[in-house]
């Protein structure tokens, strides 16, 4: 499974980001530009995933890692963001609400 750090994510601007947290978590604060597709609904929303490579984030990295493993098994080019949104916030990066 491919992974990147929040610092590497911060340096990227051209790779789509899918946030697999639940809607209430996402609306409380998320990485700017992220699209919310909760892990609990991911299987029903595969058509909403970006074409090509994309990153996947959650709060700490566990849910996104599970999502990436499942998506890779289906042929998607997904990369896990280690540390998740919690690490993003701890690094002092901006969030959207």
Question: What spans do the regions from the language model cover?
Answer:
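Rhodanese-like catalytic fold shared by cysteine-dependent sulfurtransferases
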Residues: 1-16, 20-55, 60-97
């Amino acid at each position: 499974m491919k992974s990147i750090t929040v610092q590497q994510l911060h340096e990227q601007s051209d790779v789509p980001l899918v946030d697999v947290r639940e809607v209430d978590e996402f609306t409380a604060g998320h990485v700017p530009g992220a699209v919310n597709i909760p892990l609990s609904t991911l299987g029903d929303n595969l058509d909403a995933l970006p074409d090509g490579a994309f990153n996947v984030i959650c709060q700490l990295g566990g849910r996104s890692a599970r999502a990436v493993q499942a998506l890779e098994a289906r042929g998607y080019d997904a990369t896990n963001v280690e540390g998740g949104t919690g690490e993003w916030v701890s690094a002092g990066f901006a969030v959207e609400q």
